[in-house]
């Protein structure tokens, strides 16, 4: 329809994008890419990381941007961006005391174990990175006081700001709320508290030249 309406043959790229790349990475990438290559049109679908990779495998999209890797021999996962995991908390006197402990260097992750946690759903890249972090610290997930599980990142952000509990988030998804003093943000100072985002393509498909061009652009965008 768009091709007929504009009367030109567009170069189309179909993307499947997981939650955090969709909201916090893709807008800047697309803006920068289309400044250089203006004759490309994008279709974007948002899902969790697992669902995005499934779309690559079934051929319904050209590429995926996700926050996790999977054991899929038919897919190639290329890292393009790293981000820190942080603990996001409500802004109140209780957590301001935690901030004082952090400033004095006496705060540890174990201090948060008794706090009410809001967790992401299985299938999300963030959830998998949280599981890895807990495993590295020898902390069983069952030891957390989980008060809610949600599959919507924005619902988690608002629930933290509203005082329901705390959550572990990617720093890029919490920064705007921290900057506007709606939440407090505590970095997880551990080597396993980093997460990587990947651009994914199928080894079984021949990528069109403009898709390859976008793939290379994303691969080097944050370097």
What residue ranges belong to the model's regions?
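Alpha-helical linker/hinge and terminal dimerization helices associated
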Residues: 1-6, 214, 218
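Immediate post-signal peptide segment of exported/extracytoplasmic ligand-binding proteins
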Residues: 3-13, 105, 111-115
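Central regulatory/effector-binding core of bacterial HTH transcription factors
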Residues: 10-73
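Short, well-ordered beta-strand segments
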Residues: 12-16, 64, 88, 118, ...
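A late-sequence structural motif
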Residues: 25, 184-223
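Hydrophobic hinge/microswitch elements
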Residues: 48-53, 57-61, 66-67, 129-184
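Short beta-strand->loop
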Residues: 76-86, 104, 145, 179-193
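Secondary-structure junction motif
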Residues: 96-99, 103-109, 115-138, 207-208, ...
């Amino acid at each position: 329809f768009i091709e007929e309406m504009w009367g030109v043959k567009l170069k189309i790229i179909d993307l499947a994008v997981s939650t955090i790349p969709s909201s916090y990475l893709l807008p800047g990438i697309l803006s920068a890419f289309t400044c250089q290559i203006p004759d490309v049109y994008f279709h974007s679908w948002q899902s969790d990381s697992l669902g995005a990779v499934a779309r690559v495998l079934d051929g319904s999209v050209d590429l995926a941007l996700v926050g996790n890797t999977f054991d899929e021999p038919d897919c190639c996962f290329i890292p393009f961006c790293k981000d820190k995991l942080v603990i996001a908390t409500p802004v109140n006197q209780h957590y301001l005391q935690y901030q004082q402990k952090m400033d004095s260097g006496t705060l540890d992750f174990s201090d948060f174990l008794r706090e009410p946690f809001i967790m992401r759903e299985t299938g999300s890249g963030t959830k998998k990175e949280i599981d890895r972090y807990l495993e590295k610290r020898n902390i069983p997930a069952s030891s957390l006081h989980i008060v809610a599980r949600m599959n919507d990142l924005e619902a988690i952000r608002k629930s933290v700001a509203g005082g329901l509990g705390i959550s572990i988030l990617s720093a890029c998804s919490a920064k705007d709320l921290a900057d506007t003093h709606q939440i407090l943000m505590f970095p997880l100072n551990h080597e396993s508290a980093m997460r990587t985002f990947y651009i994914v393509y199928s080894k079984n498909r021949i990528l069109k030249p403009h898709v390859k061009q976008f793939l290379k652009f994303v691969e080097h965008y944050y370097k």
